[in-house]
C-alpha cells in the first residue's frame, strides 16, 4: 500500500513538472509578427490612375482586406499578396505618406509619394468667341475670374464678352449673366458664391459689385458706377476697377479694388469699408491703412477668415488677418520662378489665387505661365506648367498655359484655371 502511494506521488510530481515546463514554454514563446510593414514602393511618383507597387510584409492576400491611402486619400488595391500590393493612385492624392492598414494596424512609408497633377481642357479650344456649347465647341474671350458653386459648376467672368458663363462638370457652357438688357455687364473680372448660393460679380468697368440670387434677381450690392474711392453703404461707395472677389463663411464680400490699391470689405447689408491699404502703390506690411499694395488682382479667403491677396506688381502673395493686419505670405518681391519656402520663392505677376479645404493656396502665376501651390507647411511648388507659354494638356510641367488670370478649387480638390491667353478653361486633378 505504501509502495503504491509512493508511485502515485512520483506520477503526480512528474505531471506537475510537465505542466510547469509547458507554461514556461508558453511564456517564452514569441508569436510571429503579422503586422503590416512597408519596406519600399515604386515608382516614387505618378499621376492619378497610375499603378504603384508596394512591397513589404504582413499584407493580406485578400486585396479587399488591405486599406491603402495616399496622403490620407483612399486608393484602390488591385492585387495583393503577403509581401506585395499593387494600388491605383487616387485623384487628387497630393504629396505625402503611403499608408497600409490591416486588421486595425497601420504602417506608413518612410518616404513621401510625389503626386503628379494631370491637366486637361474642360471647355474652349483656344479660339476667341462667345459661343455656348460643350467642350471644344464653346468659346470665350479673355476668361479671367473663376468660381465654383456648391453643385460643382464652374462660373467664368468672361471679360471680353461682357458675360458670366456657367460650365458644368461635363464641359457644357451656357450664359449665366450679362445677356439681359436689364443687367448688362461691362468687362466683369471676378465672380464668387456664398453658402446660400448667391453669386457676386465684380463688374469691373462699371465699378460696381453685383449680387444675383439663386432665383435670378440681380441687384447692385455696392458701388456708384463712377470710379473713385469712398466707403459707405450700397451705391454711396466707390471703387476703381475692382477685379478679384471672394466671400467668407459669414457672407462678407472681399474685393481687390485694383486701381485703388486697396482691399475692400462689404457686409451682407452692403456696408463698404477698407480692410487694408492706404491707396499708394507699395509693398508695406502693417495694420489696415498702414499697409500698401501694388495693383492687387486676386483675393481668396480661408475657413478661418484670413484673406489672401495676389499682389500682382509686387510679385508676392499677401495675407490679411480678420483684424486687418497685413503680412507677406509668400515671395521675396523679385520677379522670377523659384520654388522652395515661402520666404525664398519667387513669382512673376501673380493674378489670382484660391484656397482648398486643406488650407493649401493655389496661385495663377500669370507671367510664369505656371500654377503654383503653397502648402500649410509653407512650401511652394509648381503643380503644372511653367516651362513656357502654349496650349498643351499633359502631366505636371509638360502642360502649357498662356497668361492665366483665374483659378478656383472645388470641394474635391480639383483645380480650375481661367487660361486667359488660350481662351479656355483648364482642369487640374
Give the positions of each predicted feature.
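Gly/Pro-rich loop segments of beta-rich domains
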Residues: 54, 116-144, 172-189, 217-243, ...
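Ser/Thr/Pro-rich low-complexity tracts
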Residues: 25-118
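A short loop-to-beta-strand structural motif that recurs across blades of beta-propeller domains
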Residues: 162-166, 172, 207-211, 217, ...
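Residue-level detector of Asp-centered blade-edge/turn motifs that repeat once per structural unit
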Residues: 148-151, 193-196, 247-250, 301-304, ...
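Conserved beta-propeller blade signature
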Residues: 153-155, 198-200, 252-254, 306-308, ...
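Sec-dependent bacterial lipoprotein signal peptides
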Residues: 1-23
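Short loop/turn segments immediately following the C-termini of beta-strands
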Residues: 159, 204, 258, 312, ...
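Blade-level signature of beta-propeller repeat domains, shared across WD40, Kelch, NHL, RCC1
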Residues: 403-429
Amino acid at each position: 500500500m505504501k509502495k503504491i502511494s509512493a508511485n502515485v506521488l512520483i506520477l503526480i510530481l512528474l505531471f506537475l513538472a510537465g505542466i510547469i515546463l509547458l507554461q514556461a514554454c508558453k511564456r517564452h514563446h514569441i508569436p510571429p509578427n503579422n503586422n503590416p510593414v512597408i519596406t519600399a514602393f515604386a515608382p516614387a511618383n505618378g499621376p492619378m490612375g497610375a499603378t504603384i507597387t508596394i512591397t513589404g510584409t504582413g499584407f493580406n492576400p485578400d486585396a479587399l482586406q488591405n486599406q491603402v491611402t495616399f496622403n490620407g486619400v483612399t486608393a484602390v488595391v488591385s492585387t495583393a499578396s503577403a509581401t506585395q500590393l499593387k494600388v491605383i493612385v487616387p485623384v487628387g492624392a497630393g504629396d505625402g505618406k503611403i499608408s497600409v492598414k490591416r486588421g486595425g494596424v497601420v504602417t506608413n512609408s518612410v518616404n513621401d509619394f510625389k503626386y503628379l497633377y494631370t491637366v486637361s481642357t474642360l471647355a474652349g479650344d483656344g479660339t476667341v468667341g462667345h459661343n455656348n456649347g460643350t467642350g471644344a465647341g464653346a468659346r470665350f474671350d479673355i476668361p479671367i475670374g473663376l468660381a465654383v458653386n456648391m453643385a460643382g459648376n464652374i462660373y467664368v467672368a468672361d471679360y471680353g464678352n461682357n458675360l458670366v458663363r456657367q460650365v458644368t462638370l461635363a464641359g457644357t457652357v451656357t450664359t449665366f449673366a450679362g445677356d439681359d438688357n436689364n443687367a448688362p455687364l461691362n468687362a466683369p473680372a471676378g465672380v464668387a458664391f456664398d453658402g446660400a448660393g448667391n453669386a457676386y460679380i465684380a463688374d469691373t468697368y462699371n465699378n460696381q459689385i453685383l449680387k444675383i440670387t439663386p432665383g435670378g434677381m440681380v441687384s447692385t450690392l455696392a458701388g456708384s458706377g463712377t470710379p473713385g474711392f469712398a466707403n459707405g453703404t450700397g451705391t454711396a461707395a466707390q471703387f476703381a476697377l475692382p477685379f478679384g472677389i471672394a466671400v467668407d463663411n459669414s457672407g462678407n464680400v472681399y474685393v481687390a479694388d485694383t486701381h485703388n490699391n486697396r482691399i475692400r470689405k462689404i457686409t451682407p447689408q452692403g456696408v463698404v469699408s477698407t480692410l487694408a491699404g492706404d491707396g499708394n502703390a507699395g509693398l508695406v506690411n502693417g495694420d489696415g491703412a498702414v499697409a500698401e499694395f501694388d495693383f492687387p488682382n486676386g483675393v481668396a479667403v480661408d475657413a478661418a477668415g484670413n484673406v489672401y491677396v495676389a499682389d500682382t506688381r509686387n510679385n508676392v502673395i499677401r495675407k490679411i488677418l480678420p483684424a486687418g493686419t497685413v503680412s507677406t505670405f509668400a515671395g521675396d518681391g523679385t520677379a522670377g520662378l523659384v520654388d522652395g519656402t515661402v520666404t525664398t520663392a519667387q513669382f512673376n505677376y501673380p493674378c489670382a489665387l484660391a484656397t482648398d479645404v486643406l488650407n493649401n493656396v493655389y496661385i495663377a502665376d500669370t507671367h510664369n505661365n505656371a500654377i503654383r501651390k503653397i502648402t500649410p507647411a509653407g512650401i511652394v511648388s509648381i503643380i503644372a506648367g511653367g516651362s513656357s507659354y502654349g496650349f498643351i494638356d499633359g502631366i505636371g510641367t509638360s502642360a502649357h498655359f498662356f497668361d492665366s488670370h483665374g483659378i478656383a478649387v472645388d470641394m474635391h480638390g480639383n483645380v480650375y484655371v481661367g487660361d486667359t491667353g488660350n481662351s479656355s478653361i483648364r482642369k487640374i486633378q
